Structures are given as structure tokens and as C-alpha cells.
A protein has these predicted regions:
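Elongated, amphipathic alpha-helical interaction scaffolds
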Residues: 1-192
Length: 192
């Protein structure tokens, strides 16, 4: 069955879906490859950051994440999403830019005493990175949406498939044309 969904690459759509706790837990569990037990958007936990040609949407969360010892650990999650192709050539430059933003825009998102995981969702390919989901430094995850189909991880691939811009409707780029069949029976994906 083919369905049309709002394109989550757009900030308003992405913000709306990530405000749903169940969707945020499903999405972040797939990215982090760890179970997110509970999640809360931080007060003032989203904003659009614009600097020259870079436009980034930022959300902050505090999450309880199941660790390897099967106990829960509170963690800050900072999620940055950009749909504009930036002149970021290397992940190190992107991470340096992120640190600059955090220093300049101390926004009080999250609890600074907690460990922080930063996730970058990029709607473009950067540098020579051929890995769709990469961890170039501890606590940093880069997701390159244009090459997500190359991921070998089925849960990441399924969740991130909702960003597949190859599904964009020709008539309206704000909509994606999605074959619902692969999600049949997966209650989290059906909800998403």
C-alpha cells in the first residue's frame, strides 16, 4: 500500500514528530543502537540556528538509556539536523563548528553534568565518509541521509528510510511517497 507522508526533512515536520515520545524513543534507539527507556524534550529544547550559509535545526533531550550492564543511565542528547548542503568538508570541521555553536549559544538545554551524545542528521554527503552512520569521536554520531540505503543495520535502515528523499513526490517536495508494506506488523513504525 502506498501512502503519502509529510517530508520529515523539513524542520516543522521533524519537530512535530520528535515531540511524540514514542517516535522520539524509536528514532533515537535506532540511531544510538541502545534502548531509550524514557525521553523528555528539554525546556526550550529546539531552535533554528542560522550562520552564513549554514542552517541547522537543533533539539535537546534528556533520556534514560539502557546501558550494557542493563541498568539505565541519564544522558543529554543534542540532535542537529540540516537540510541545506553546507560547505562542511570533513566531520572534524563539523564537530568544531558544533563546539563553537555550543560555546556562543550557551542555551541551558539539558543538564550539563550528564554525559552528552550529539547526533548530526545531514541531508547531504560530507567529505570522503562513505559510512551512512558514523561515530568519528566518542559521543558524536553523524548520519548522512543520502546514503542511508548503504547501512547494513536493519533497524537503522528501517527508521531512517522515512527520510529517503528518493521518495519525494515530483508534484510536491513537501511529501514523500512511501510503500507501507515493509512496515506492516511493526507497531512502532506504523505509529511513526
Amino acid at each position: 500500500m502506498i501512502v503519502y507522508i509529510a517530508n520529515p526533512l523539513y524542520d516543522a515536520v521533524f519537530k512535530r514528530i520528535m515531540e511524540e515520545e514514542r517516535i522520539a524513543k524509536t528514532f533515537l534507539s535506532a540511531i544510538l543502537q541502545r534502548e531509550v527507556v524514557s525521553i523528555k524534550i528539554c525546556q526550550d529544547g529546539f531552535r533554528n540556528i542560522k550562520s552564513n550559509s549554514i542552517s541547522i535545526f537543533k533539539m535537546g533531550f534528556v533520556a534514560s538509556i539502557k546501558n550494557n550492564g542493563n541498568s539505565n543511565e541519564l544522558t543529554n542528547i543534542r540532535l542537529y539536523k540540516t537540510w541545506v548542503d553546507t560547505d562542511v568538508l570533513e566531520p572534524r570541521q563539523h564537530l568544531a563548528w558544533q563546539r563553537y555553536i555550543e560555546e556562543k549559544n550557551s542555551d541551558g538545554i539539558g543538564d550539563e553534568s550528564l554525559p552528552t551524545i550529539t547526533v548530526f542528521l545531514l541531508a547531504h554527503h560530507i567529505g570522503d565518509f562513505e559510512t551512512p552512520v558514523a561515530c568519528p569521536a566518542p559521543g558524536n554520531i553523524i548520519v548522512q541521509l543520502p546514503i542511508i540505503s548503504k547501512t547494513q543495520n536493519s533497524s537503522q535502515k528501517k527508521v531512517l528510510s522515512i527520510f529517503d528523499q528518493a521518495r519525494t513526490c515530483r508534484e510536491d517536495k513537501h511529501l514523500l511517497k512511501v510503500d507501507y508494506t515493509p512496515y506492516d506488523g511493526d507497531t512502532d513504525m506504523e505509529y511513526m
